[in-house]
Amino acid sequence: MRLAEMTWQEAKRAVEEDRLVVVPVGSTEAHGPHLPLDVDTHQAGHVAELLAERVGAVVAPALPYSYAVTWIGFPGTVTLTAETFQQVLVEIVESLAAHGFRRVMILNAHRPNGSSVDVAARRVIDNLAPGAEFQVSALSYWEPGAARVNALRRSQVGGMGHACEFETSFQLATRPELVHMERLEGVHAPLVGWDLVAPGEPARTYEAWPAPSEAHPAIFGDPTVASAESGQAFLDAVVDALVEFVRRLESGAGGSYAERSTEVAR
């Protein structure tokens, strides 16, 4: 169910039913010569709706603007500062909490947002009274299912970064009319030193952001091996893992600082 399409009375009922609210977070930024600017926003919203269908959650409107400085030199990219982005998230979540929603998930689809999403969630909790009954999850949608996606990939490690096998396959599976694979001909898109789903990503080291050029067409990784079939498999894997994550929380597993049960499952 979509929050934006509810009346306020229906939203009140959702509060009374103690429904989880999923806040999808994307970006508006360059994604190579072959994908649209709204890839992250679309993917966040699409995954959120599939998750909501299975766990009975409410989906808030997807946030299309975030911390996208990496690609600000590429026309069409829109960015917020990290500070502004964090504050927007804090105020969105606090608004939901003020109405009585007790469970919120910030579902990110843009890797550079990760630290800001985490900071925003922590700030919301810091502002609560100790012992308040409220829980906010902060995660990127691929994280719970990363190992499953990694097992399905065709690219080498470093091939799943940005406008890559992962994102291109996702778009081929869901919006093929917006994907232009023919525009990748002759494009140089090397593997990169980090990867969305491979285990053991090293400590991050940052360098100056790339300038727009034919030599760097806003791609990190390898989109040439992407396919609709892979995209559907990736999508199924990440949604299944997210459902399992939500079910664990609903079972009383608690948040990151809850005491871990030592009881052996029987």
Say what each PLM segment does.
Residues 1-105, 109-266:
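Extended, histidine- and acidic-residue-enriched regions that form the cofactor-binding/catalytic faces
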